[in-house]
Amino acid sequence: MAELRWHPLIQDWVMVASHRQDRPQMPKDWCPFCPSGGRVPDYEVLKYDNDFPALLQNPPEPDPVANDFFKVAPAYGKCEVILYSPEHTITLPELSDSHIRKLVDLWTERFEELSKDPKIKYVFIFENRGEVVGVTMPHPHGQIYGYPFIPKKIELELKSCREHYEKNNECLICRMLKEEKEFEQRVIFENEDFTV
């Protein structure tokens, strides 16, 4: 079962995907994301469709658990895995600058491609690591989800940006960056392109 359920308390959609509980624990001596494992070709970076997606291009009809108050919707969308490297134990910070460039190019390509689907309203690129958050694959990877809705937190951020602009005639993100740079206490790194 994969469906979206409206959560009236937080006024946001929640993904329900019971089939994800069936994800296997991989043997310690085999990894499907390593080229030698036989599931993926040789690669530097690779897009791989998630074997256990929470969102589907052809979702089933939701279970009959809805009424006027508890709404459900098909779990339309796309879930992709982005393999960072064929090296099984490397982490993102250990990748070379040129390799990270290839990864960013792939993220950009996938973002642009998923954004062409009129049913996808938000594209989320992320990495989660460790068994504690449910990661079953230790191989270095991230994910991209194409949501059929804009998550509430993102709606709030957009609303804050609009309201700040209407009130102050300036970009809120630009103002935050300006304040951080002037305050200096929280800036970790800065160059001509980025401030962290």
Tell what function each PLM region has:
Residues 1-139, 145-196:
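Active-site microenvironments that recognize anionic phosphate/pyrophosphate groups
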